[in-house]
């Protein structure tokens, strides 16, 4: 008979290969698969591998014009999820040739582009990716990284302090600049545009950039420290985004900001390249992440979005707090915080890390803790995140009863007290409250802050837990 065998056949015949030895150059993915009733896990896992690589629903004659064995994704291992009915972790290996070099956009289009609407699955979640060194090397990564940032700012041996300017919408540019100045003068390293602040009728971007730059230079002159304000360059088109970044560079400011999920990976990578070429640091906000990562059985875990950001490029990224008003279980959060900062991360399922990841020499990203935190959290934050982090207190600075500058003073005093106590060998986890109370003696600003927030807690059960 001439031709090929037409018709529909089971995916598992071609795409489930339990004997496959993964290659060092493969991209590996761990999917949490919830098959529809009656669909065997092997078929579900194979379907994911097929639909996110070379497969389609029926045999096609053009299959004969290529080598499926060379290009197909393979489901090479399946394990049931402990404590969950009908959930499995399916491990899929993708040959590197399926992906365009240096394109996070293409990587995601391939791996998570189509398969999440697949009918044979009730739900699907991408838990982790192993990016091979061969692929890592095709990305520029963060514009500068942790060490270069410290050198630029001349700030060592402690976490950096930030503050998001509130109310986030409605201030005029001049009043906004005033708020920035007060915070920086009081002792913060950075202030931040809120992620929703782009260029609205009440405050156009160019006016804001100019007033913030003025605030920055005034605060620098008064304090003798380098200051920064994250100027949000996010815009409706890539050209407009670049125009804003160029203007920021012309003003001579040290850092700009981007919302990488709403802005998109293509825009983000473009901006990251510009930032490296022009000496700008890049702060990344993760607006929209919870739409993708909050459901336990469907979507993508934030650790995947964090890896993607390190490849696309950013010097800071928001990463939850463990202690404030937003999600983040401690071990899981520290898992992806280490993925952002370190060169090499061992597989460790207790922290949700499914694969060993080697970033070789790609620069690291500073995790930003932000959301509902205040001076009483400082010992815990210093202990959990360590020196290489940015701690951001929005309401925890601007909500100070005496104003922004005293709010900034309170945070800086609390931070310096915690760092000193840690360096003297004290246990921040146990003696934290005591350390803050002692520091209050020398700082009326801190004492006032401690009084305001002594009872505030945001306590709900975490959603993001290991099984």
From Swiss-Prot:
Where would you find this protein in the cell?
Plastid, Chloroplast
Give the protein name, as stated in the record. Ribulose bisphosphate carboxylase large chain
Q: Which family does it belong to?
A: Belongs to the RuBisCO large chain family. Type I subfamily.
Biological source species: Tasmannia insipida (Pepperbush)
The feature of type site (Transition state stabilizer) is located at: 325
PTM comment text: The disulfide bond which can form in the large chain dimeric partners within the hexadecamer appears to be associated with oxidative stress and protein turnover.
Q: Name one Pfam family in it.
A: RuBisCO_large_N
Q: Which CDD domains match?
A: RuBisCO_large_I
């Amino acid at each position: 008979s001439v031709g090929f065998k037409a018709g529909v056949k089971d995916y598992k015949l071609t795409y489930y290969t339990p004997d496959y030895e993964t290659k060092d150059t493969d991209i590996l993915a761990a999917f949490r698969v919830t098959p529809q009733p009656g669909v065997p896990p092997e078929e579900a896992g194979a379907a994911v591998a097929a639909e996110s690589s070379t497969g389609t629903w029926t045999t096609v004659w053009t299959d004969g014009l290529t080598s499926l064995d060379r290009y197909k994704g393979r489901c090479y291992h399946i394990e049931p999820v402990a404590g969950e009915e009908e959930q499995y972790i399916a491990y899929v290996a993708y040959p590197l040739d399926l992906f365009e070099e240096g394109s996070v956009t293409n990587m995601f289009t391939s791996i998570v582009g189509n398969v999440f609407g697949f009918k044979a699955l009730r739900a699907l979640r991408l838990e982790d990716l192993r990016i091979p060194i061969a692929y890592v090397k095709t990305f520029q990564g963060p514009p500068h990284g942790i060490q270069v940032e410290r050198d630029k700012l001349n700030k060592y041996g402690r976490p950096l302090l930030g503050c998001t300017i509130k109310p986030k919408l409605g201030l005029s540019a001049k009043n906004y600049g005033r708020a920035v100045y007060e915070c920086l003068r009081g002792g913060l390293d950075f202030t931040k545009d809120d992620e929703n602040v782009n260029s609205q009728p009440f405050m156009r971007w160019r006016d804001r950039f100019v007033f913030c730059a003025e605030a920055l230079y005034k605060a620098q002159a008064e304090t003798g420290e380098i200051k920064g304000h994250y100027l949000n360059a996010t815009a409706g088109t890539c050209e407009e985004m670049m125009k804003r970044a160029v203007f920021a560079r012309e003003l001579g400011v040290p850092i700009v900001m981007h919302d990488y999920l709403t802005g998109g990976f293509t825009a983000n990578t473009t901006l990251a390249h510009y930032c490296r070429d022009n000496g700008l640091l890049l702060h990344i906000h993760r607006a929209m992440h919870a739409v993708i990562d909050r459901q336990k059985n469907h979507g993508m875990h934030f650790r995947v979005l964090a890896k993607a950001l390190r490849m696309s490029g950013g010097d800071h990224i928001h990463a939850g707090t463990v202690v404030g008003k937003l999600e983040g279980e401690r071990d899981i959060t520290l898992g992806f915080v280490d993925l952002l900062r370190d060169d090499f991360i061992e597989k460790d399922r207790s922290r949700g890390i499914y694969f060993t990841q080697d970033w070789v020499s790609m620069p690291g990203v500073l995790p930003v803790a932000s959301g509902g935190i205040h001076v009483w959290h400082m010992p815990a934050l210093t202990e959990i995140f360590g020196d290489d982090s940015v701690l951001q207190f929005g309401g925890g600075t601007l909500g100070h009863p005496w104003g922004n500058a005293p709010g900034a003073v309170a945070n800086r005093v609390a931070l310096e007290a915690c760092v000193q106590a840690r360096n003297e060998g004290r246990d921040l986890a146990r003696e934290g409250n005591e350390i803050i109370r002692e520091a209050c003696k020398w700082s009326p600003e801190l004492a006032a802050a401690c009084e305001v927030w002594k009872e505030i807690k945001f306590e709900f059960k975490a959603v993001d837990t290991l099984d």
